[in-house]
């Protein structure tokens, strides 16, 4: 029996997910693994994310529009009408040191490209924690399509940025 067939029979809500939703979840698992291994050197944390973003910023890669679509989506999901939404608490930022940068970016208090990149990657990191530690199963993976679509875009861009920085470093040492 394939894992998908087994999940359809045994995982609450899995059989109700569309092929697109299932694909996005699979893509996320693979992209996160690549990102954490290649970019964060198998040491994912808020600190390593922020250090990585600083390298990108120093290399001149971060512009205001770099992560604009994802930033707009996450702002709309987690901050509306001047307050953080009920979904914001489900990120469980307290489990990752409660980084203020996420609040500042989502509320519009900080629009610096490096802050936006850090905040988005921290949100994606929390998606990883919530998915792989089981919290997302509490609500049967419902309403996750856009979350993982944007998270995947952020991860792909992050891997590309990291490779550019690595190429620049290699070019300087030759």
List each model region and its residues.
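Amphipathic alpha-helical interface elements
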Residues: 1-108, 115-116, 137, 174
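A generic "alpha-helical surface" signal
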Residues: 26, 115, 119-122, 146-149, ...
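Charged/polar positions within long, soluble alpha-helices
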Residues: 40, 44, 129-136, 159-167
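Repeat-unit-sized solenoid/scaffold elements
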Residues: 107-109, 113-119, 162-170
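Histidine-centered, metal-coordinating catalytic motifs and their short helical/loop contexts
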Residues: 117-138
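Short conserved catalytic/interaction loops centered on acidic-Pro-aromatic/His motifs
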Residues: 138-145
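Amphipathic, Lys/Arg-enriched alpha-helical patches that create a basic surface
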Residues: 146-174
